Amino acid sequence: IPDNIPQDLLDKAECIIVLPSVKKLAIGIGGSYGRGAMICRGGENFTGSWGAPAMFALEGGNIGIQLGGQATDFVLLIMNVKGAKSVMGSKVKLGADAAAAAGPKGRTATAATDVVMRAEILSYSRSRGLFAGISLEGSTLRQDNGANKKLYGREVSAREILLQGKVAAPPAAQKLISILNGKTPKNLSDPKSLQ
């Protein structure tokens, strides 16, 4: 988890989605695609330690004068229960089905801005070694059922993994869980946001 994502936002996140190497291609009409993992705090109202991840895919498109391609890493902080449950549906369009915004950056960045307080999801990206807030508005985030089946050896939904704890975290997820439990062990959200 990058150092320039404000610690107070990490501590208040109910879930985190990590999407490494999202591919962006553009020749007049652009598109992006990537796969990654969503991991949530366990227990009632997401107050426990980090649990087993569910696999997700990000897809997006745009039109404009553009040429080229690149790979970008994304970290999405899901800031409340409503945002978490929206993402766990079959698919969610960021900005339409869930309020998304580019997250503030820097250790001293304040989390009290209007954009941050209204957003259900804050997005960060890294290209060429630099992490910054970026908007993913208009992109679609959906469960990657095939990847979940491959990871857990059976069909299991994101809701069953993240909310109901129906599967144990696989060995491949232990490093991410350990990093998150070390970096942000407790949910410090306002109790009102957890309802």
Predicted features along the sequence, with ranges:
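Small-residue-enriched, tightly packed secondary-structure blocks
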Residues: 1-195
